[in-house]
Amino acid sequence: MLAAQKQRLTELFQAAVAPLVASTDLQPTITLERPRDPSHGDVACNLAMQIAKPLKKNPREVAQALAAALLDNPANRDLIEAADIAGPGFINLRLTAASRQAVVKTVLQQGAEFGKSNLGNDKKVIIEFVSANPTGPLHVGHGRQGALGDAMSSLFQAQGYDVTREFYYNDAGVQIATLATSVQARGKGLKPGVEGWPESAYNGDYIQDIANDFLAKKTVSASNGEPVTASGDINDIESIRQFSVTYLRREQDLDLQAFGVKFDNYYLESSLYADGKVEKTVDALIKADKTYELDGALWLRTTDYRDDKDRVMKKSDGTYTYFVPDVAYHTVKWQRGFTQAINVQGSDHHGTIARVRAGLQALDIGIPQGYPDYVLHKMVTVMRNGEEVKISKRAGSYVTLRDLIEWSNGEVVDGEVRDLTRGRDAVRFFLISRKADTEFVFDVDIALTQGDENPVYYVQYAHARICSVLAQWTDGDEASLDKVDLSPLTAARETALLAKLAEYPETLQKALEELGPHQVAFYLRDLAGELHSYYNAERVLVDDEALKMARIALMSATRQVLRNGLALIGVSAPARM
């Protein structure tokens, strides 16, 4: 159902119910939904059941009165064809054929804008995702964050929000020191497992690559950063640290580029210390009497803000616990004007939510409860050749995002540099094809198949099929299809396809409200299914000119919606497969 149709039906129900509640304080909510069973009509409303009990009436009788009010008005006949009462008092409406067909004209006229709205009214939203430590290549978990975060950002942009995609670099922790000593050890000729190899060091082959470039005094640069030139002195641990961090930031940039993800801003954790923001945050909490000292440590009274226990802010050795810079960072987000902040992170961050929110509330600077929002995802298991893959040579202890993209792209041909679009499309679609809070098994073998079991192929093939049909239509102009008579579109498969097209705008809004971009992937799979069923049941280029033109318009509109949805989740829409 189109937005304009939904608004009109809402107003019609409001007018119909007004006389029934005029002498009461009732203010019923008009909720319109699509019935799960298409045979029940196009629109379902539970209004009668809302008001029947306070009116002391039978809900089915109330539903009959409301339905009669809708049908008796001649002005409604262009929109409503029939109304039925189902179950305890649901009102099921069947829209006119012209109303169902109107979506084709709307899609063709709006094109790439179909599904978008100004709901956000330019409200500033910051979505932080990936935010990997610069200590190694991106892994598949970062890939899931990238797919989720980028699609979520596009959802908010499509609904009129002013979105900033941000990558937060944790470049100030103990892991950075471990990275530096790992590179130093490699530079001295040590290898994992031999005497003198540092405990907890990083073992991947990439550490040797960094050491080689450091000894060669190479220069590297990364996003939003100055170039760094290695000193070449293997005893210069600070130069090793700076070079290694920048080297890996550059590598992560290349991974993200291959994945088709671009960030608007990169924020360094180290800048929070350099600018004094961490100290200022701690001082503000102390002055507000939200802290206390115990056993030589500084504690925050997080139990005052729904946490299950108070948390240490500064340990007895004088170092801060990891949630303190997080509080400072989110204070900065708020001060930058982001009234909504969303963090896409792994489920292992669950324990930080309460303490970060508690710290922000304790500052008492106007930040609302529940800020920021969190979308936590569960782990990804990678299967290849029927077996689980747990490590890669590149990283040493985990499967990298780059591995997954390359594996899903297919085999190397004659050693040539490949276009990684196929692999990127598969990984991005697969990684948002489940709810974030469910574990996901990524089967590379399925990603490489060209059949219905491969969801991205299934959707892209629907788009390519339409392109093939329209390429055979050589005696017309697509620009004029929005003027075609659509009344011949009466076949059952056409009705189902029309209904699915009309669901797209509401799908986007629901996905945004629930922070669930997986719903877009679900929708695209369903739309592709309707298209394939229609394609197998009906011919498009028939001899009947009026029917042919109506079906061509329907195909063009379906292609546009497939293209819009795929673009939103960062997947290509090929014309040929």
Curated annotation (Swiss-Prot):
Q: Does the keyword Repeat apply?
A: no
The record's principal subcellular location, in a coarse class, is cytoplasm
Name the source's superkingdom.
Bacteria
What CDD domains does the record tag this protein with?
A: Anticodon_Ia_Arg (cd07956), ArgRS_core (cd00671)
Q: Which UniProt keywords apply?
A: Aminoacyl-tRNA synthetase, ATP-binding, Cytoplasm, Ligase, Nucleotide-binding, Protein biosynthesis
SUPFAM superfamilies referenced in this protein's UniProt entry, alphabetically: Anticodon-binding domain of a subclass of class I aminoacyl-tRNA synthetases, Arginyl-tRNA synthetase (ArgRS), N-terminal 'additional' domain, Nucleotidylyl transferase
For this protein, what is any one GO molecular function term? arginine-tRNA ligase activity
Give GO cellular component annotations, separated by semicolons: cytoplasm
Tell me which EC number(s) this protein carries. Answer: 6.1.1.19
Where is this protein found?
Cytoplasm
GO BP terms: namely: arginyl-tRNA aminoacylation
Q: What's its catalytic activity? A: tRNA(Arg) + L-arginine + ATP = L-arginyl-tRNA(Arg) + AMP + diphosphate
- The residues forming a coiled coil are none
- Where do we find the motif 'HIGH' region here? 132-142
Top-tier EC class = ligase
* Stated family: Belongs to the class-I aminoacyl-tRNA synthetase family.
Cross-referenced NCBIfam families: argS
The record's note on quaternary structure and interaction partners says: Monomer.
The protein here is known as Arginine--tRNA ligase
Organism of origin is: Janthinobacterium sp. (strain Marseille) (Minibacterium massiliensis)
Record gene name: argS
